[in-house]
């Protein structure tokens, strides 16, 4: 059977809407700019879709060359500009500690209002730090489809947050 690459995705802010790409450079730290930013709560703990499922509705973009970050909220509000680095902070993700800088400005109030609780946007000190298990996540369409049942039909593959989506593999063959 023929194996094809059917999707490439990234999200400059961890847990926000995935951005589709036609082509990308892949390095040992994953896709450039992917999950470079993340959210923390008022206690400094990482916030993901597990804490606020609605985060996937916020679109974002980051132009590294211009140091320009943009978020587009579902109501159409756009916040765009240079993310001003505030104080340094350490965050723990799946047992790994890494450093970043809190981003100052309107970003925090807008995202907090959307989530319904206080959050702060953080820029990771180094690219490629904010992955869950691996810098790249590879998923086959048939693996996702095999999880469908009478209760869960037409599962949106984006909920699995793949970096690379492949078609033409047997379910879970990408694990090997």
What residue spans do the PLM features occupy?
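Small-residue-enriched flexible connectors and coil-helix boundary/helix-cap motifs
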Residues: 2-176
